[in-house]
Amino acid sequence: MKRLIVVAGPMGVGKTTACRELHRRLPRSAFLDGDWCWDLHPFTVNAQTKAMVLDNICHLLNNFLRCDACESIIFCWVIPEQAILDAILARLDLRGVGLHCFALVAEAEVLRERLRRDVECGLRDEDVILRSLAYLGKYASLDVDRLDVRAMSPAEVAAELARRCGCPVSDVEAQPNRISAGASTENA
């Protein structure tokens, strides 16, 4: 049975890193980071761009769900509200698909420190810290399985996600890297 693994959480909690690790470990998997579907410069939030990102996400996820080469589809994005998750899931063809939804969370101080390091390395803007901390409490009300990642490595998070999704142990062995949405297909 195909599985869709949705991973939500505030910026900086480790969604992308953990999902990349999970993607690397699961055979026949596809990985989509919702941020790739809204990569605008300057970043613009309005009704049109909100509709665009949902269209982009749902189009790509449905293509992965229809593709026989994909057994596990991993999707991560901030998703701070149940309405956003519901809007995405309502537009997907989930017949015959096992759905597994998670939120990665951590204590505010842990999240602040992770983001501070990213800011110091030039990976994020300073304002992300307050925005991410403001989102943190919203994940308590999502109808998802929560995973506190404050003391976990990305590999440990990936292994726990796989376990909670019921992936057989043999499925969780490290696999060679493969192309994901947003990656170059030059040598594919």
Which residues are covered by each model-predicted region?
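Conserved phosphate-donor/acceptor-positioning beta-strand/loop module used by diverse small-molecule
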Residues: R95-L115
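P-loop (Walker A) phosphate-binding loop of NTP-binding proteins
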Residues: P10
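ATP-binding Walker
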Residues: V13
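Hydrophobic anchor at the beta1->P-loop junction of P-loop NTPases
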Residues: V7
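Pre-Walker A (Motif I) flank of P-loop NTPase domains
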Residues: M1-L4, A69-C70
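Glycine-rich phosphate-binding loop used to anchor ATP phosphates in small-molecule kinases
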Residues: M52-G96
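Conserved substrate/cofactor phosphate-moiety recognition/catalytic segment
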Residues: T16-N62
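Small-molecule kinase domains that catalyze NTP-dependent phosphoryl transfer to phosphate-bearing small molecules
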Residues: R117-E160, C167-A188
